[in-house]
Regions:
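Conserved SAM-binding loop and adjacent beta-strand
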Residues: 82-98
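Functionally constrained cores in energy, signaling, and assembly domains
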Residues: 11, 15, 30-31, 87, ...
Length: 132
């Protein structure tokens, strides 16, 4: 994933976080680099597609994928100098919220949880994985 982020940064001039977002979008879109107005170049798109094919996410658990994205985002945020309020919710906070939800709800009760400021989605994914 880091290779794809690097290619997008150099080719399009994206920040680390923007390149990570584009990379994740490309992975979701059948591991295919999207070209808009000729960017990235055909050569770079082929390089990106090769990197996406090498990243076999089916061999990882949901938690491993979440952590891979989290660590890549933390690296990108550090390199970009992101403001504190734009950074990912730490796992410790997610686990604390999940524990509180677990303690305050009935085990057989169906829950609906909404995070209207979802951002990266790390808080919700941490809660979901904890409550499963």
């Amino acid at each position: 994933m880091a290779k794809a982020v690097e290619v997008l940064q150099k080719e399009i001039g994206y920040s680390n976080v923007e390149a990570l977002g584009e990379t994740l979008q490309n992975i979701v879109n059948d591991n295919t680099a999207q070209q808009v107005e000729g960017l990235p170049s055909q050569k770079a798109a082929e390089e990106l597609n090769k990197a996406y094919q090498q990243l076999d996410l089916t061999s990882y658990s949901s938690e491993e994928i979440r952590r891979m994205i989290q660590f890549t985002f933390l690296k990108a945020a550090k390199e970009d100098g992101l403001q504190m309020n734009h950074q990912m919710t730490p796992d410790a906070i997610g686990l604390l919220v999940a524990y509180m939800i677990d303690q305050m709800t009935k085990k057989d009760e169906s829950l609906q949880i909404a995070d209207f400021a979802a951002g990266s989605g790390n808080l919700l994914s941490t809660i979901l994985l904890f409550l499963q």
